From Swiss-Prot:
Belongs to the UPF0575 family. This is UPF0575 protein C19orf67 homolog. InterPro entries: DUF3314. GO terms for biological process: in utero embryonic development. PANTHER family: UPF0575 PROTEIN C19ORF67.
Length: 301
């Protein structure tokens, strides 16, 4: 019988001292239930599409269109998990966080684009309204929520088709594609927690507006200049209840914070850029509503 090398016995006390290595769940096993749920939701979306394209029963199509908001709501807990697990601070997966983050956000983007495609298809057949001023429309849908600090939560919404920034089309030629609600919670001394919401948008502006030209005499190739900005309310005052009741839509302006360029950013990249803006300008512990417009102004880059 061969004797074990002497070096083996010298390493045994070290191994015993360190103890057994902690078992790591393989990434494939970790993602298995997540991808299973994705496949389930994608199959549901395929069913909605198949009935629309191949069924001759118009009543059934109308019923499915009415069920569309329910299906989108059914996807919300999944989006909540994906975005919170990928982006929330502090990270929950340790050294694997970046790999997990990339995988989760790819899944989130895949489902987001599929749902957008489905809603647009139903709208093209006249079964779904995309007009934001209609309370029964599906102009946008919820795509997740995550925390950037204990007192700051970000909710993501995506517009199925670019919508005018306001119903009054002011600012002119400005269209929104995504919205983020930044909810800031502050501790009130006697009444518990208080919260405030700021709104941020991914928008594009037709470039002939910047050149001082109108649609009638602009060049045929109109480019879209993408940016991220913040909703700046112009009234009514928060405590003026009568004015709020009589106001069809509160007026607001667009405070551009970051110029992105002529290529539309992906769903994931746009949210990454917003997080950089929030953390870089105000810091995760400072509510943006406490800063005036000058404190939030950023040079376009």
């Amino acid at each position: 019988m061969m004797e074990a090398p002497a070096s083996t016995s010298s390493r045994e006390p070290l191994a015993a001292e360190l103890g057994p290595a902690p078992a790591r769940l393989p990434l494939d096993s970790m993602f298995s239930p997540i991808t299973d749920q994705l496949r389930y939701l994608l199959r549901k979306a395929d069913d909605f599409q198949s009935y629309l394209l191949y069924s001759r029963d118009r009543v059934q199509k109308e019923q499915l269109a009415k069920a569309m908001p329910t299906f989108l709501t059914m996807c919300e807990p999944y989006f909540l998990y994906l975005e919170a697990a990928a982006r929330s601070v502090p990270p929950i997966y340790g050294a694997l966080q970046e790999l997990v983050r990339k995988g989760l956000l790819e899944i989130s983007q895949q489902l987001t684009l599929r749902l957008e495609q489905l809603v647009l298809m139903y709208a093209s057949f006249g079964f779904v309204d995309l007009e934001e001023t209609n309370p029964l429309s599906i102009s946008c849908f919820f795509c997740g929520r995550f925390s950037i600090s204990p007192s700051h939560d970000v909710s993501i919404f995506r517009y199925c088709t670019p919508a005018a920034y306001t119903a009054s089309h002011f600012p002119r030629y400005l269209y929104k594609k995504m919205r983020w609600n930044l909810e800031t919670t502050t501790e009130a001394s006697s009444q518990g927690a208080d919260s405030h919401v700021d709104y941020y948008f991914l928008c594009y502006r037709d470039t002939w507006e910047d050149a001082g030209q109108g649609p009638a005499n602009s060049c045929p190739q109109i480019q879209k200049l993408w940016s991220i900005g913040r909703w700046m309310p112009l009234g009514p005052a928060e405590d003026d209840l009568d004015s709020w009741i009589l106001c069809p839509q509160p007026p607001g302006d667009y405070q551009q914070l970051l110029t992105i360029g002529f290529e539309e950013p992906s769903h994931v990249l746009a949210t990454d850029l917003l997080v950089q803006i929030l953390l870089g300008q105000a810091g995760p512990a400072r509510p943006p509503s406490a800063a005036g417009p000058a404190a939030w102004a950023a040079p376009a880059s």
